[in-house]
Amino acid sequence: MGFITKAIPLALAAASVINGAEIMETRAGVQTLADKYIVVMNDGMTDKDFDSHRSWVNRTHRRRLIRRGAKAMGGMKHTYRFPTGLKGYSGHFDEQMINEISKRADVKYIERDARVQINAIEQQDNVPSWGLARVGSKEPGGTTYYYDGTAGEGSTAYVIDTGTDIQHEEFEGRATWGANFVDDMDMDCNGHGTHVSGTIGGKTFGVAKKSNVVAVKVLDCNGSGSNSGVIMGMEWATKDAQQKGADKAVANMSLGGAFSQASNDAAAAIAQGGVFLAVAAGNDNVDAADSSPASEPSICTVAASTEQDGKADFSNFGQVVDVYAPGDSITSAKPGGGSQVLSGTSMATPHVAGLGAYLIGLGKGGGPGLCDTIKQMAIDVIQNPGASTTSKLINNGSGIGFLSFPLNIYEEQWSKLFDL
């Protein structure tokens, strides 16, 4: 994910800072989308003023197309109106139109739309998963998952991803289709989103086995999408969660890209809306401060650990990381039935979202404050976590005496789970 490219003349960038919006430069290596932009409005803008601005954009864009013979562009495509926080829009504009928009005093900043992608990197067949056992134990190497029988009941997890196979037997009818902002196929044609959903709420693979799962599709069959489409999914999930009870909701984003202020602002708006959000730190073995939305400080950023409690060699790190979670060779659901093994911070993140849903089911709070609770419950075991990075690994409390009330503890043996 990235900012507006350096191809725009320096004089234009300088003028826009003086007269109105800041036009952000694109960082090296960012895969931007030609002539597509995200425009973010000033904080506190009223709906009336926002509607007035949008009308001006549409009028000006049409006038350019008709009177000036400008190159055909699609104009405004998506409008963002989060319940709290970010207001803005994205669209297809030429350089001159962006110049006009940048002069407006009511625009906060503009960035170029860019590609985002899933954060799974490896696949391995026929390997039993270990992540659940690690979440429920204070020592590595366990084969039993201990958890309270509430198991996230009453919570809802929004999986902002490639979609979810809602008919998969893992979900027992608890998964529903929410919205699609990337294509016309309401299905998971990639497999990533179903795997993530299974780790959150699957009956076999899930941390919160009784939670509800809502599929929000923002990535295509190749696991790729755009900042603008992802932000649409984030907005939809926030509004839907608020209608149903934000304090009972968690959101998972096992995706990311290069730094994007718009993506970070959208993530912050989810948190401001009262929803707990877990985000993947990324798989480039670099500081996650340069990744989005992982670098947004108000959400819960997750790095990936190995079965031996080490940092996974691919995992990003840094001060923005809140916790580690199992992310190497994780078994979960795949579309059409059965399971597959994937690795990545994408696989670590749903362990944290699932733990958030689990704690909601236990009545231990809700909203963005769950990240602090999860950090307090975490155990200090990660070896060589990376420069300026926490060594905390998540734990559900059942094995370390953190939760100070009787638990209806269940245990699951891997031999039963996987028919080994």
Swiss-Prot record:
Glycosylation sites per record: 222, 252, 396
Signal peptide residues on this chain, from the entry's feature table: 1-20
Matching InterPro entries: PCSK9_ProteinaseK-like, Peptidase_S8/S53_dom, Peptidase_S8/S53_dom_sf, Peptidase_S8_His-AS, Peptidase_S8_Ser-AS, Peptidase_S8_subtilisin-like, Peptidase_S8_subtilisin-rel, S8pro/Inhibitor_I9
GO function term, MF aspect, one: serine-type endopeptidase activity
Propeptide: 21-119
UniProt-listed Enzyme Commission number(s): 3.4.21.-
GO biological process, one term: proteolysis
GO cellular component: extracellular region
Subcellular location: Secreted
Keyword Protease tagged: yes
A Pfam family per the record: Peptidase_S8
Enzyme class: hydrolase
SUPFAM superfamilies referenced in this protein's UniProt entry, alphabetically: Protease propeptides/inhibitors, Subtilisin-like
Domain of life: Eukaryota
Domain Peptidase S8: 129-413
Primary localization class, coarse: secreted
Active site, renumbered: 161, 192, 346
Family to which this protein belongs: Belongs to the peptidase S8 family.
Function: Secreted subtilisin-like serine protease with keratinolytic activity that contributes to pathogenicity.
Protein name: Subtilisin-like protease 7
Organism: Trichophyton verrucosum (strain HKI 0517)
Originating gene: SUB7
